[in-house]
Design a protein with these regions (language model features):
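Amphipathic alpha-helix face/heptad-repeat signature
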Residues: 1, 151-154
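Internal maturation/activation junctions in enzymes
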Residues: 1-30, 34
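Active-site lining segments that contact anionic ligands and/or coordinate catalytic metals
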Residues: 9-11, 27-29, 37, 59-61, ...
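Structured core elements
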Residues: 13-16, 29-33, 41-43, 48-49, ...
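Short Gly/Pro-enriched turn/cap motifs at secondary-structure boundaries
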Residues: 20-23, 53-55, 72, 108-115
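A short core secondary-structure module
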Residues: 39, 43-97
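A glycine-rich, basic-preceded beta-loop-alpha segment at the flavin cofactor/substrate interface
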Residues: 48, 87-103, 108, 115-146, ...
């Protein structure tokens, strides 16, 4: 999976939040039922998934937090699963569509160029990443880095807005000069 993501042929998401629990991940309901072949059937809904569905890449690899059948309650019972939008054939080619569906597009106030959606996992084939019930640790390694990236985005946008406003204020003419000349004065 990783080489295709690094090449830009596939993209990835992080699927944490659910409609009923917001930031309290201990309350997630997404289920992971183990199959005889070691894969899992993932069922549940996730919200606020950035770039959760698009046709810019051949496949989207979702990292999904879910609970196995006998998982402890709370955050100690959460595991991490890799769930591709399209299943992967044995030869590495794209296979049939997995049970990952877009329910809706989220309405946002900011960062309009970064769409977010609601995803439904309907018995989607998934693969456990890392040890069972330790998924939150792995996910938050990525989340902490993403928080820094979002902060840097905000800094870049605010710096651009400031530089644009400063440049405009230096060229904008406003009203008459106070020294009784007939020319306009800078803002």
């Amino acid at each position: 999976y990783l080489p295709k993501i690094v090449e830009g042929k596939w993209s990835g998401t992080m699927c944490l939040t659910e409609p009923q629990c917001g930031t309290d991940l201990g309350l997630i309901k997404t289920k992971a039922i183990k199959n005889e072949n070691g894969t899992y059937n993932i069922s549940g809904q996730k919200i606020f998934i950035t770039s959760g569905d698009h046709d810019l890449t051949e496949n989207i690899i979702h990292l999904v937090l879910a609970r196995t059948q006998d998982a402890p309650k709370g955050t100690k019972g959460i595991s991490l699963f890799l769930v591709p939008k399209y299943e992967i054939n044995d030869d590495g080619s794209i296979g049939p569509r997995n049970g990952v569906n877009t329910v809706s597009i989220e309405s946002k106030m900011g960062i309009k160029g970064s769409p977010a959606c609601v995803l439904s996992f309907d018995d989607a084939k998934g693969y456990m990443i890392g040890p069972e019930n330790k998924g939150l640790n792995s996910m938050f390694t990525m989340m902490n880095l993403e928080r820094i990236v979002v902060g840097i985005q905000g800094l870049g946008l605010s710096e651009t807005a400031y530089q644009t406003a400063l440049s405009y204020s230096k060229e904008r003419k406003q009203g008459k000069s106070n020294n009784n000349s007939n020319g306009e004065t800078d803002l």
